[in-house]
């Protein structure tokens, strides 16, 4: 079982005298930086000029270019997209990452797959909130927190875990729970979850169900409501109480269909595909494919994204959501 940590296990004094540079001010960067600042820690923001620069300044941060932030900071937390981190590290961070500093991540991709190779005289740690940046911020302001993972890749100082736990406390994660894992385990399980279940698996399952009903002559609106709109209702029940709560909340007819038909949809063929996907992650084949895709301006990524944006389910979804009051204020 994974080790668990809470507020009582974390001491903010481990980083209270240090300067933390948050590189990036997107969803995670903004959420983490604001929480750290509100926890009384010294935070600077490393960015290139643009809207995020102006936003960070307006929210009370000292903002500078990435290279200067890396030089000035004791702890450097990289919170820009995975595919950008390697180049930014080499050109703007590495020179300022001097002996005794701490390099941080919220996802292990670039360390685990060798896109970033830090010097041997720095600590390399991870604090990975298990929720988007706006949720990290919102729960903090409510006096709660989002669970997080910590991992230690290099612990030259001997204080890597203390630093990670203190940072996790600074963003509010120890108010919930913090689990200790490894860079390898976090990276591989995170990618697998995204590809096979949460994003890739779910969207493909929904599209297949939608297409099956539409091709059989059912109204696209009915297909959308049955295979996409109601997904949230079921997922929320599973999230709150596992499969048991979900099954206790649906009809006996639905539960019988779930138990007898579900394994026919996700059967041996799907299981074998999941094993293959996991192997591609473990061997680095997926990481290589993704890095190469970015080097040639993402032709596959862009084509597949456009195709899904033009799918009938998206058109129908926009029309249906426009009729529902709960979606009026959502962007």
Curated annotation (Swiss-Prot):
It comes from Methanospirillum hungatei JF-1 (strain ATCC 27890 / DSM 864 / NBRC 100397 / JF-1). GO terms for molecular function: ketol-acid reductoisomerase activity; magnesium ion binding; NADP binding. Mg(2+) 1 binds at residues 190, 194. Keywords: Amino-acid biosynthesis, Branched-chain amino acid biosynthesis, Magnesium, Metal-binding, NADP, Oxidoreductase. The keyword Phosphoprotein does not apply. The gene is ilvC. Pathway: Amino-acid biosynthesis; L-isoleucine biosynthesis; L-isoleucine from 2-oxobutanoate: step 2/4; Amino-acid biosynthesis; L-valine biosynthesis; L-valine from pyruvate: step 2/4. NADP(+) binds at residues 25-28, 48, 52, 82-85, 133. Residues 182-327 form the KARI C-terminal knotted domain. Substrate binds at residue 251. The active site is at 107. Residues 2-181 form the KARI N-terminal Rossmann domain. It catalyses: (2R)-2,3-dihydroxy-3-methylbutanoate + NADP(+) = (2S)-2-acetolactate + NADPH + H(+); (2R,3R)-2,3-dihydroxy-3-methylpentanoate + NADP(+) = (S)-2-ethyl-2-hydroxy-3-oxobutanoate + NADPH + H(+). This is Ketol-acid reductoisomerase (NADP(+)). Its cofactor is Mg(2+). The keyword NADP applies.
